[in-house]
Amino acid sequence: MGQGLWRVARNQQLQQEGYGEQGYLSREQSRRVAASNMSHTSHRKHVQGGIDIYHLLKTRKSKEQEGFINLEMLPPELSFTILSYLNATDLCLASCVWQDLANDELLWQGLCKSTWGHCSIYNKNPPLGFSFRKLYMQLDEGSLTFNANPDEGVNYFMSKGILDDSPKEIAKFIFCTRTLNWKKLRIYLDERRDVLDDLVTLHNFRNQFLPNALREFFRHIHAPEERGEYLETLITKFSHRFCACNPDLMRELGLSPDAVYVLCYSLILLSIDLTSPHVKNKMSKREFIRNTRRAAQNISEDFVGHLYDNIYLIGHVAA
């Protein structure tokens, strides 16, 4: 970005000193007139002994013109893709170069909604003086604040009118963004069980295999590093949600939320057993089937075997 700004300033300086396009053409015309007055022999010798100065200058001019891409000449979708890789600081610098594009409200609206998929303010009439560029800066500032102190971050969003003071709205905001630090988010959800309840209901596990659904769940709601009450709460909530999303499958397999709870715990223990380098004697498929069916009766042996194969081939469910 710094190189691009330097290039713009340098081009302006060259134009002031007479090195713009008009200056270049006038000097080039003088050189060509002088070259035509040279003798055929000396000119031929010059061309053979060195580089064609006209070709060199023409190549240099074309390179200078092509050295910096004008985003206004690109399709809006491609421009949006390029600028979506920039953070707030770089976008501010970009606005100095691409002022019209960087101040486009549609661009900032797209950046806001692609990074923070849900905000309460999206569904409200915008207040006087509202701009998506300003909103992007506030969302970025609020995310950084959350990653330092979750409660202060949520309060910041509410003070700016970005989020309503509602567990459901906070849960939707968390579900639709990946800018929040997962360790801070885990602490926040452990303290705000009302937000956790609404966050769980946003997941749709319909027609998903149990281990894959559990992986998706733990990608959004990270599991604690140690066993305890919070992990039990997460598995309990997941089990009820999984059964609610797959009622036909539960009837077919004869599974209840309690049985799914047992299977989830078995999958977590199996994941640790198969992936930990400290465990020398890995659990076999036969042992897993026997232990699981002992804890949860009336479960198909083939179904439990497929659970083992999934962990063995794909890996940890809570990594």
From Swiss-Prot:
Query: Which residues belong to any copy of the F-box domain?
Result: 68-111
Among the entry's GO cellular component annotations, what is one? ubiquitin ligase complex
Q: What does this protein do?
A: May promote guanine-nucleotide exchange on an ARF. Promotes the activation of ARF through replacement of GDP with GTP (Potential).
Q: Which GO terms describe its biological process?
A: regulation of ARF protein signal transduction; ubiquitin-dependent protein catabolic process
**Which PANTHER family does the UniProt entry name for this protein?**
F-BOX ONLY PROTEIN 8 (PTHR10663:SF372), GUANYL-NUCLEOTIDE EXCHANGE FACTOR (PTHR10663)
Annotated ranges, domain SEC7: 146-276
* Keyword Nucleotidyltransferase on entry: no
Q: Which Gene3D superfamilies match?
A: 1.10.220.20, 1.20.1280.50, Arf Nucleotide-binding Site Opener,domain 2
* One term of GO molecular function: guanyl-nucleotide exchange factor activity
What is the superkingdom listed in this entry's lineage?
Eukaryota
The protein's matches in Pfam families, at most eight in alphabetical order, are given as: F-box-like, Sec7
- TM segments? none
Database matches in InterPro entries: F-box-like_dom_sf (IPR036047), F-box_dom (IPR001810), FBXO8_F-box (IPR048003), Sec7_C_sf (IPR023394), Sec7_dom (IPR000904), Sec7_dom_sf (IPR035999)
Q: What is this protein called?
A: F-box only protein 8
Species in which this protein is naturally found: Bos taurus
Could you tell me which SMART domains the record lists for this protein? Sec7
Q: Which UniProt keywords apply?
A: Guanine-nucleotide releasing factor
